[in-house]
C-alpha cells in the first residue's frame, strides 16, 4: 500500500500527465469554461492532513518538477463527522472559478461526495456547488476542527477539487504559460479544539508569512470614518439608470426626509465604455454633462459629508478599451492581451496605472471608492505569463494608492484567494451575494452566507452585508438588525421618499453615526456546520456589544413550509462566546440578564435555556448583560444595539456612572437588598449620568 507522507519532508517525483507548455494554454478564460480535472503533472506523494505540526502550518513543495505549469496532489483527510466546503455555485454556461465574485458560498456536507450529487439540498436561490473551491472546514471524529485554505505564491495559486468519489485533490498552477519554480506554497491548515480559534490561528499563520499574503488583522486596521455613518447607494434603486439630475434630485429628497444620511455612493451606470470596456475616467458625458462638479458642490459637513464612487478593479467589467482618452504616459503602462488592455506587465507599470486611477477620483472630490469585479481581474490575465503576479499586483497597487491618498475603500466581488489575502490596508469587503428587495429566499441565503463567510473574511476585514431597503415589507426591519450586528457599513438603497424611519433610526444617533458591535457577528457553535435554510432548526448569531454585553439574534431561515415554526433559545453559557471574539467575558458577574429587544423585557437567566418560538421568516434579538455589583447595563432601548449606546465609567455597589451616547430611554437593571428592578431613565441629552440605587 502506498505510504502516506508529509509533503515537505520528501523528494517529490511525478507522473507526466500534462500537455506541453508550447501547446494551446488550457487556462485562457471564457464564460462557461470550468477547470475541473484540468491537465496537471500528478505528484506521487500525498498531502496528509492527518499530520498536523502547529509550528509549520503552511505546506510548501520543495522540489518542483521542471517545465510544469500545473501540479496536482491527492489529499488525505482525517476521519471527519461533517464539514463545509467554500466555493462558488456552478451554473452551466456561466462564469466559473476563479471568478468567485461575491459567491464564495458555504456548502455543508456529511461526506464530501454529497457535494457532487445532482439532488444536493443546497441553497434555494443558488445553483449547485462548484467542485473547485478555496477552503475547507472539517469537524473531526476526535472532536477537534480542521481548517484548510488555498494560498497564492509569488506566481502560483492553489485550489481544491472535490471529486465524484468523495476524494479531494489539490491543484497548484501559474494559470498560464510559464512554469512553476522555486519553493512553492501549497496550502495552509490548522487544527484546534475551538471552531473559532481554528480560523483565527490559520489567519495568524497566514499573516505572518509575507510570501503568501499582504494582510493585517481587522483589529489592527483603521476603519474609514465615513463607514461609521449611515449611507445611501444608487444601485438597488436605479441599477444602471442613473444620471446627474436623478442624483441631485435624490440628494434633495434625502435632505428633506429628515434621515441623517451622511454619504452617497454612486454605483454603476456612470462609466464611459465601449462593449463593457473602459474608455475614459471622465464619466459618461450624456448622463453627466457637467462631470462631477455639480454633485460635489452638494457636500456639506453636517449633511451629506462624503461621496463615494463605484468602479471596477480591471477598468470596467471586461477590462480597458484600446479606444481610450488616457494620456500617453498612461497608455504606455497598459498592454493588450486576449481582447483587452490590462495594467502591466511590470509591478511599476501596474502601480502607475492605479496611481492615475485613484488620483483622478480624488481630484474629482470623491472620498472613497467601491471597487467591484475584483475576482474577474485574475481571469482577464489567465493563459498569459506572470498571471498570478500581475493580478495580485493590481490588488496591492489599489491598496497602496488608496492608502497613500487617504481614500476609503470598499472591496466588492472580491472573494478569490488573491483578493482575500491582499487587503493590506482596506477594512471592508462584501461578504455575500446581493440582497434583493421582496425576495425571501434570497434574503435568507444572503444572511446565511454573510454570517458564515465572516468566519473567514472577518479575520482581516469588516463584512459588508450589502445595501438594503428599509421599505422592504418582507424583511426591512430584520435586515436592518442584521446590518447593525454585522459591524460593517450600513447604507440604504430605497427611493428617499420611501424611507421607513422606524427601521432606520434604531441603527443610528442623531448625527447618523451607527451603533456598531466590538467585533462582527458570526454564527454560534451549533449553527456553523448546518444549513439553516434546510435544517429545520433555528439559526443563531452573536457579536460582542458595548463594554461587556453579548448580543444574540435568533433566526428562522428555513425555506420549507414544514418548518414555518421552530424553537430557539438563549442561555447563560452563550455569554462566554464573547471570549471567542477576543473580547473579555469576565466570569466575576453575579448572573446574566437577558434583555428581549422586541418585547423590551428582561429576565435573569438560570441554569436552563430560555426558549423562543420563531414563526415564519423572523428574528429575535437579545442582549446578554452581566450583573455586577447589583447592576446590569442594557443601554438605550430604542436602538438595536442598546449596549453600544453607553460606556460604563464607574460601578460600585451603590452607584453607577455612565457616558450615554444618544437620547432615548436608558434601561438599567438593579438588585438592591433582594429587590430587583428594571428601570427606565429618560435621556434628553447625551453625556455623563450618575445613577444611585
Name what the model sees in each region.
Residues 1-25:
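Bacterial Sec-dependent N-terminal signal peptides
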Residues 25-263, 285-288, 306:
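Carbohydrate-recognition beta-sandwich/jelly-roll modules
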Residues 79-92, 574-599, 669-681:
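Solvent-exposed beta-hairpin/edge-strand motifs
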Residues 225-388:
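Aromatic-lined carbohydrate-binding/catalytic grooves of carbohydrate-active enzymes
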Residues 292-299, 389-409:
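Alpha-helix-loop-beta-strand connector modules within alpha/beta enzyme cores
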Residues 317-362, 396-503, 522-530:
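Glycan-recognition surfaces
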Residues 483-486, 491, 530-590, 621-629, ...:
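Carbohydrate-binding surface patches
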Residues 605-646, 666-667, 675-693:
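C-terminal beta-strand-rich structural cap/linker in extracellular carbohydrate-active enzymes
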